[in-house]
């Protein structure tokens, strides 16, 4: 008896991807977007198969991601943005709701909706995760999207 194993590959050619970007903290989210596009293209995606939708902030990401996921056009939807802690509880509400919303959309639609939204305590932490010391989390989200899209095609 042999065990069947499913594992997604990292080949993006022939797949279409949606990316939702929160404009708030654009100096970070634009770097995450660049990283996501770079990740997709490096793995074989054609730029014409990538659609980017900008929303005002992280809180608005789930509704745009849901619309894209429900459209049937995309193998996966990547969500990027930055929520940076301030001196009020606003951070906790926004970070919690966007993460729950993204997870729910993925489960409800069966489309991989990838959480690439930074939730950091400081601007410095966000900068580190948007292409400096800690890599680019937008790139990482793109690689995850490719793998999950290919995995779900096998299941």
UniProtKB/Swiss-Prot annotation:
Pfam family, one: DMRL_synthase
Coiled coil: none
Residues engaged in binding (2S)-2-hydroxy-3-oxobutyl phosphate: 87-88, 129
Signal peptide limits: none
Pathway this chain belongs to: Cofactor biosynthesis; riboflavin biosynthesis; riboflavin from 2-hydroxy-3-oxobutyl phosphate and 5-amino-6-(D-ribitylamino)uracil: step 1/2
Gene3D superfamilies: Lumazine/riboflavin synthase
Keywords: Riboflavin biosynthesis, Transferase
CDD domains: Lumazine_synthase-I
Active site per database record: 90 (proton donor)
InterPro entries associated with the record: LS, LS/RS, LS/RS_sf
Catalytic activity of the protein: (2S)-2-hydroxy-3-oxobutyl phosphate + 5-amino-6-(D-ribitylamino)uracil = 6,7-dimethyl-8-(1-D-ribityl)lumazine + phosphate + 2 H2O + H(+)
Full protein name: 6,7-dimethyl-8-ribityllumazine synthase
Organism (species): Ruminiclostridium cellulolyticum (strain ATCC 35319 / DSM 5812 / JCM 6584 / H10) (Clostridium cellulolyticum)
Gene behind the chain: ribH
